[in-house]
Amino acid sequence: MRRTGVMLARPFDAKRLAKWPKPYILQPKINGRRARVIFGTLGNPMIMSSEGHIINSLPTLTASLKGLGLKEIILDGELYVHGWTKQEIDRVVGRSVTIHKREAEMQYHVFDLINGFPQSQRREMLYWLRLEQTSTGVIPVPSVDADSLEEDLEHWLAAGYEGLIIRHKDGLYQPCNEKARSDYLMKLKPRKLGVFPIIGKLEEESIYKEPKDALGAFLCSHEGQRFKVGTGFTRADRERFWENEFKCRNYLAEILYQELSERGVPIFPVFKRLVAKE
């Protein structure tokens, strides 16, 4: 069914990103049920799906939203519980006759406001709502300013999210009924998986380029081209890998990535695991 009233992200495009001003606004990409919450003049919340249907299956969450005391404002987010599958979420949210026994566990993760202000101002307005301090089950999605994507992509993938949302700091809210896919919003979800030979390791450095006696990244190769990939290891494991003799030639790195670059190396590589050569 066609969606309406919400802003939809374009697939990641490096050329488009290169035209955007820095810093970018980054958020984890969550895989829930998209929904707006519309507060009227009396402060009564209405949860509306991205297809324009009112959701009445979540009385506990609706009460929490009413407790926010908001009026004449529209929140944009997803009905979501971290660690639940999309099917589990749909089973709870999609009830139309009876209430699911786990409806009280459902949360609303808020990532934007719907109004006429630029993205950076919308984020500031959302911050001052102090949602995390006023209501149970209403959770602001974290956001960071960044000049590059790799570190945050790796962090949020490791935390169990499906990728990154990248926001143009000056972008206006463009509902999909006005613009099919927003010019100011992109999603990055690495989908390709491959194994690559490890040919070396690089030492971790401080921001002042001082060595830290720990593994910083593996050096890998593909078709004669070298590239590096972080590991996501704990500090203790990074120190252990650096101090101990690690025979790189005996292992491959399994890597999740967006696509191969023109020179044949993975774009936005994310380390998954070590694979012993047979």
Where are these regions (language model features)?
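Conserved, charged/glycine-enriched, solvent-exposed linker/hinge segments
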Residues: 1-21, 25
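Covalent nucleotidyltransferase
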Residues: 16-136, 277-278
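Flexible glycine-rich surface loops and low-complexity tracts that mediate binding to linear polymers
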Residues: 28, 71-82, 168, 200, ...
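Amphipathic alpha-helical
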Residues: 140-195, 203
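Intrinsically disordered, low-complexity regulatory tails
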Residues: 89-103, 107-108, 115, 226-228, ...
